[in-house]
Structure formats: C-alpha cells, structure tokens
Amino acid sequence: MSYRELVVELAREHAEALSDALLDLGALSVSVEDADADTPDEQPLFGEPGLVPDRTAWQHSRVVALLSADHEPAVLLAAAANEIGLAETPKFVVREVEEQDWVRLTQSQFEPIPIGERIWVVPSWHDAPDPDALVLELDPGLAFGTGSHPTTRLCMEWLEQSVKPGQSVLDYGCGSGILAILAKKCGANPVIGIDIDPQAVESARQNSERNRAEVTYGLPDACPEGEFDIVVANILSNPLKLMASMLASKVKPGGRIALSGVLARQADEVAAVYARYVDISVWREHEGWVCLAGTRRESH
C-alpha cells in the first residue's frame, strides 16, 4: 500500500482541533510540529515550567497527517476545516510516501554518534565502533536526548571534562537520562535525574538499566534535599531563568553548574539571571546553541 503525507501550516489556535478532525475523518496518524523548528524563532516545548498552561501548539504550527492512498487529501482537509469552523481551507502540500520497511528505514537513519574525546552514543542495533570507548547504548524514543542535538552534545562534552569520580550529580530535566547515565559512567555517585514528564522518567529508568548505570530518577517533588557537586540542566532559556534560584541552591559552594537549551542570542540574558548566584559564562557554542558553565561562590 502507498501512502500520502498531508502537510498544513496554520496558526496555533487551530492546530490541535484540525489534528483531531483529521483523525476522526480517517487519517492514519497526525503530528503537530513547530514550523519554526531549528530557526531563531523556535519556541519551547509545551509543558515546561513557566509557560502558558493552556498553550497546546506552537504559534506557527505544522500539522502532518499520514493518509492511505484511498483518501483524497484536498477533500479530507476541506472536510476537517469545515468541521472545526474554518472560513476557508488552509493551504497545504502533499508528499508521496513510498511503501518500505519502516523499522529498517528508521534504524538506518540513526548511526553511532561520537562525542567529545571518547564517548559514543550507540543504538542497540549497532556495535560500538571503538571497543575502548565510553559507550552509551540509547535508542531514539519519546524522551528527548540522543546526543544528536547540539545542546545534548555540549552538555556531554562538558560532563566528560568536568566530572570527577565520587562527585554527586543532579541532572534536572533529564529527558532520556543520557546526561545522568554519562555522569555515572564517568564515575559520579550518587546521580539523580529529575523531569516533569512521567514518561521521560520511565524512559530514563529503562535506559539506565540497559546501560547498567545506577541512577535515581523522579519527578520534581521527589528531588532530594541537599546540594550537589555538579548540577546540569539542558532545558530551555525560559524555564532556566524561572528556576535559577532553585537550581543554584542545589549546587554546593564551590560546586559547578552547566546550563544548555540556550540559543547564543539568549546567553547574556540567562547568564545575567544566574550571575546573582554563580560566576558563569559561555563555555562553548555549537550550531547557534551555547552551554553556560559556572561555579557557585563560597558565600552569597
């Protein structure tokens, strides 16, 4: 069977309703994406702390629907638009999707990723290219963080250079658990991973088990009291600013903090908020993203 992809870009207030209508009318699957992804106008993921709670799509949204060949895209979209009360049918693009081995195709798109001096992130269907490398086995999944995004890479490079055996590490916004797992493999103990998404927490636990890395995961209300030698947070600039006091308070005096999910143009603003608590600056930039790193002052 052949398939078609119907791609529609429209305003935030209609994206979720159109998605539901397309599914009701027979679409096989529908996803909503940020139409400005990987540009300076990219918006934070929804559900992050400090964001508008009822915001369910991006300001400039892209709806992508997978249709079987027996559905006419224009007719289906017109019906969906009418169902949700749009005055006119949005502009759209149709892409032909060839029938193929989707599992094999997906796997072929994810190769082992070298990071830093000795780290390899390796999907389960591959062998590590270097038997002496520090290997993290991680498959692409629902939780963010496979090492391919610049912010994940930056944090991993920083951890590789910064973690000393026996140091305590807090990974706040742990996603897939990739940073917490790396910290553990670098000798940190204990390592704590926190995320607001229960699905991410479960994914991180599974990834840690697969990598034989003992990490404790939980939701924010389960974050332990006390301070850590190292705190790392790869989130986004808005929640990072909102949580500055809390995150800084988790760092021991003289301990270190690394922040990413920050675009280069946002670096000064984020650094200014954290400067109240830590001596912080841009550690490294990659593809328009930065990692900020700093040390908590002995007293403040």
UniProtKB/Swiss-Prot annotation:
Domain of life from the UniProt record: Bacteria
Keywords linked to the UniProt accession: Cytoplasm, Methyltransferase, S-adenosyl-L-methionine, Transferase
Disulphide-bonded residues: none
Cellular component GO terms, alphabetical: cytosol
Catalytic activity: L-lysyl-[protein] + 3 S-adenosyl-L-methionine = N(6),N(6),N(6)-trimethyl-L-lysyl-[protein] + 3 S-adenosyl-L-homocysteine + 3 H(+)
EC number, UniProt record: 2.1.1.-
CDD domains the UniProt entry points to: AdoMet_MTases
Cross-referenced Pfam families: PrmA (PF06325)
Top enzyme category: transferase
GO molecular function: protein-lysine N-methyltransferase activity
Subcellular localization(s) per the UniProt record: Cytoplasm
GO biological process: methylation
Annotated binding of S-adenosyl-L-methionine, by residue: T152, G173, D195, N234
Role description: Methylates ribosomal protein L11.
Family to which the UniProt record says this protein belongs: Belongs to the methyltransferase superfamily. PrmA family.
HAMAP family in the record: Methyltr_PrmA
Descriptive protein name: Ribosomal protein L11 methyltransferase
Organism of derivation: Burkholderia orbicola (strain MC0-3)
